[in-house]
């Protein structure tokens, strides 16, 4: 990609001679090469250099080649290199090592050379020395347009180039978050055609359907660590990356805390202080008067900018686009880091609070309905004014990495969180097509404490012509859940209508579980795993074979909320393998395939289910996937096919949660991202899914489609720079989702729905300050539709919502 320097270029010199000097310390260079060395630089020689940090690999190669290079290693940040193995001339070797880094070799004005970002001028490649700032380094790590990153953190495998792994991975950047004014992780994930958003069991949590299978907010990792993030809704203001891993990922990341994530996982990367100070203030407004402010401050300190601090503060409150719904969001985070020559440390601390008053709930369907009632008006709210949800989380984690040598790096990380939730919920269960139904009441405080640890060792070695990337990992999480509830009997439920809601007084509770003011322990879980993997490289790493195995153990104890009696206790362990293959036959084309298995904690019934205290045994899943990627430097695309098998679970019309039979999801996915034409950025894709139930009770539902899985999903998104108006951009996006069934018997279904979004932004300077104005309009047509039937209940799509903001970067 093209990266523009932040300071004027020195006179440009074509890249001809590579008589270079190596000196990784600032101001330190080695003597220039002799004439004999210069003459020999184009002669290929055999080099075997292990993988490691790019600046170290460059130094080793230059010393081995007998040529000097002078540059500041901080310019390359934490970029990694797979090393070099084979016959190369000096020029070929440096080109191979710097490929995709965003940097090239340039003359420093004498006989020496340095590094500079890739610059394209008049169609010919000419390079000039420049000072590199933090933004330039970031630009080299993303596709043109800045929406999607080239690498992602893959748990025990560490940070990997997306094109070199046998899995389907997409990493969305902070720029995408800002430009789309995405306020939650769900807003970001909607950019991928394999993902749709549902709602939790009446408490306004976000549930993500990835490849037709749910991922709960509990099961999103933070910098590779599970169990330390807010469990229901996650704000985006402190995030640098939202990384989506499609398919079972227990091998890579370990077992998820709540047992979801078979269809895919999400890892969030926190913001870090950049070499250039960050001073950003954003004011925003949206919905029906909801306003907010966000402050983002970052600074590096000390020798070589080794110490960094990043602070993000957010407050947003007011009415949403749904009638009478009010939401307040508070976020405060602090990220600290240290980057030494061999030691890297980081610590992240956060506090988040979400309060939703009279939030629009999900809708249940009673027995006897012949079809699904149509969705109410997009802005209609069928919640009672006494319903609310309050979600409060305090969380933190620390991580350390140390390079024992150029080829071996160890890491250890630990974190914890405390969650306090309160809420009074009320959802309608419809009994006829006219929208009549009965509403309940559930008051359910919930406390949760988690502690999480992980450690590992990543290394590289060579055995003859075969390279090895070795990974050893340990992971563990310890959780404790406390809950209580007050509710009413079925006979005491109030009558109401979905299309003509009548305010009702809050019913008096008639059924109780535990002490509302001091909830008792209802669950404890221990999740531990050990994993080892080896990625073998053949033919100069043009063929990569990943072999791995993970030993997973789950210990779960459960207690009845009413009596306190133990009602579940089990311990189960399983060893699951992973096989992955990457073939790179041509420069821009990669083929990949994988077979991966996983073990997950048994599904948890919703609090609204009759058997809310039931505990289910762990479930085992497996996936087979194959695909091809196209990487054209400025843009990329991928096409893949997959098959996932896992036990099926759902809530029936009798309000009983069941695990029944096996669900098989088969799909074809297409993804497109980057900037194929100058000034035009694309972010979209399509997926077609076929699901099937097998082995159900008495075979009653065998061959039916699984609940809540659309037949297809289509995303078309584009960003366009307006010609003649520098800094002005228009954007548009279409979301189209195919029909899906609401019940396992396939007698009730939802129709296909469409949503159209528009956006614009304008960036300019005023008094040397960068100002960005943004406006995004979601659901332009204000279409009313049922967005999801996941779990056997209905989630309505958001109404037309206008978001505007102004950001000042000092």
Regions found by a protein language model. Give the residues of each.
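Conserved C-terminal beta-signal and adjacent last beta-strands/turns
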Residues: 470, 593, 624, 707-810
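Membrane-embedded beta-barrel scaffold of Gram-negative outer-membrane proteins
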Residues: 399-415, 419-425, 592, 617-675, ...
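Acidic, small-polar-rich N-terminal luminal/periplasmic segments of exported/outer-membrane proteins
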Residues: 63, 68, 83-85, 128-276, ...
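Acidic/polar loop-and-plug regions of large Gram-negative outer-membrane beta-barrel proteins
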Residues: 316-320, 333-403, 416-448, 492-519, ...
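Outer-membrane beta-barrel translocator/receptor signature
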Residues: 237-240, 249-332, 338-344, 394, ...
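Gram-negative outer-membrane beta-barrel transporters
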Residues: 539-540, 636, 643-645, 659-744, ...
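Structural signature of Gram-negative outer-membrane beta-barrels, strongest in the C-terminal barrel
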Residues: 337, 448, 467-471, 475-479, ...
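Surface-exposed extracellular loop regions of Gram-negative outer-membrane beta-barrel proteins
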Residues: 355-369, 478-482, 578, 582-625, ...
